Regions:
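Glycine-rich, flexible N-terminal cofactor/catalytic loop recognition
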Residues: 17-80
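Short glycine-rich anion-binding loops that position phosphate/pyrophosphate groups of nucleotides
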Residues: 28-30, 106-110, 190-192, 250-251
Length: 252
C-alpha cells in the first residue's frame, strides 16, 4: 500500500494535481449558514468529495444545509474521532494524492477541543498543503467577548469529573491567572454545567471574574461577565446548553 501510495503521489506531484487538506468550520448550533459561514468557504465545501469527520450523521446534515443539491451518496466519509487509531488515520493520507479532503468536527473549528490534529500533522509530514477555513470558534468568540486578557490565555479542555479534583484544578487556574495575568478557558459536559458553576462560585475569590458564554452565534446566545461575588446572586440558565467558561483573576 505504501509503495502504491508513493507511486501515485509522485505521478500527481509531477502533474501538479496534489490535493489539499481543508479544515472546515461547522455550525455551533441552530444558525443560518449565511450568518456564520462565508460564501467562499461554502464554495470550497461544495467541491470536496472526501470528508474526515467526527460524526458522519452530523456532517451529512450539515452538508445538506450547505447545499440541498449535494449528492451525499457520492461522497466518502472517514471516521475521525476520539476512537480513531493513528494507524487508521494514516490510511486517510493517500486520499490527498489526487484530491482535496476536508476535516469537519461536530461543532466549530476542527483541531481545537476536537479531533483533527493527527491528520493535519500527517498532511504536513507528507508535504500536503493545509488550509484552515474561516468560521465560528466558540473558544475564540468567548475569549474576545469576555473582556479578559487576550494576550496571555490557556484553553484547558474538560475539568476533572470528581468534585475535589475539579475544585483543586479551579484553584490552580485561578492562581496562575493572578500570578501570570493569564485568562483561563475551559468547558464541561452540558448536563454538568450547573455543578461546575456551583463549584466555581463556592471555591474561588469573590473578586475573580467569570464569563459564561452559552449557545454562541445562536438566537439563544448568552454571554455575561461578572465577579464571583455578583454571580452568587444569579443562577444562569445553562443546564444542558453548550458553554465556555472563562476565568480571569482580576477585579473590574
Amino acid at each position: 500500500k505504501l509503495i502504491r501510495f508513493g507511486i501515485i503521489q509522485y505521478i500527481c506531484r509531477k502533474h501538479f494535481i496534489m490535493g489539499k487538506l481543508y479544515l472546515i468550520p461547522n455550525l455551533l448550533g441552530e444558525t443560518a449558514i449565511g450568518g456564520v459561514i462565508p460564501e467562499d468557504v461554502v464554495h470550497i465545501i461544495k467541491n470536496i468529495k472526501v470528508f474526515a469527520t467526527e460524526n458522519v450523521k452530523n456532517t451529512r446534515r450539515y452538508l445538506k444545509k450547505i447545499e440541498k443539491s449535494i449528492n451525499i451518496d457520492e461522497l466518502t466519509f472517514l471516521d475521525l474521532n476520539e476512537h480513531s487509531d493513528i494507524k487508521d488515520i494514516e490510511t486517510y493520507v493517500p486520499y490527498l494524492a489526487d484530491q482535496d479532503v476536508g476535516i469537519i468536527s461536530e461543532a466549530g473549528c476542527p483541531g481545537i477541543a476536537d479531533p483533527g490534529a493527527e491528520l493535519v500533522a500527517l498532511a504536513h509530514k507528507h508535504n500536503y498543503q493545509v488550509i484552515p477555513l474561516v468560521g465560528p470558534s466558540s473558544i475564540l468568540l468567548a475569549l474576545i467577548a469576555s473582556g479578559a486578557n487576550g494576550q496571555n490565555f490557556s484553553f484547558n479542555g474538560y475539568l476533572p469529573v470528581t468534585r475535589p479534583e475539579r475544585i483543586k484544578a479551579l484553584k490552580v487556574f485561578e492562581k496562575q491567572s493572578a500570578v501570570e495575568n493569564r485568562t483561563q478557558l475551559f468547558i464541561e459536559t452540558p448536563y454538568r454545567n450547573l455543578q461546575l458553576f456551583e463549584d466555581i462560585i463556592s471555591a474561588l475569590s469573590p473578586t475573580t471574574r467569570l464569563t459564561i458564554a452559552c449557545d454562541i452565534t445562536t438566537e439563544n446566545e448568552y454571554i455575561k461577565t461578572m465577579s464571583i461575588k455578583d454571580w452568587k446572586h444569579v443562577k444562569p440558565d445553562i443546564n444542558k446548553r453548550p458553554a465556555i467558561f472563562v476565568l480571569y483573576a482580576r477585579s473590574f
